[in-house]
Structures are given as C-alpha cells and as structure tokens.
C-alpha cells in the first residue's frame, strides 16, 4: 500500500504561520494512533478560534 499521501510536509506549518500573523498557531501532532490537534488563539481576545 502507498501511504505517502498521508505525509504532511513540515514546511506547510511554517508557511501557514507566516501567512497568518494575527493568529498564534499551537499544534500537537502525534502519529502513534493519536489524533492531530490544532488550536488557533486570537492574540487580542486570548480565546480559541478553532480547535480541531
């Protein structure tokens, strides 16, 4: 089976951070059967905009 499609280049995260200066991106990635967690905090309100 070809699982290459599941790989995500690390450059993508840095690129997104640079393109969205208004938000602080905190990521926790575990590839041992654990889910991908992405939390975006608004710098002004200090509240989560998105958790997924």
Curated annotation (Swiss-Prot):
The keyword Glycoprotein applies. N-glycosylated; contains glycans with bi- and triantennary side chains. One of its GO terms (biological process) is acute-phase response. It comes from Equus caballus (Horse). Belongs to the serpin family. This is Alpha-1-antiproteinase 3. It is found in: Secreted. One of its GO terms (molecular function) is serine-type endopeptidase inhibitor activity.
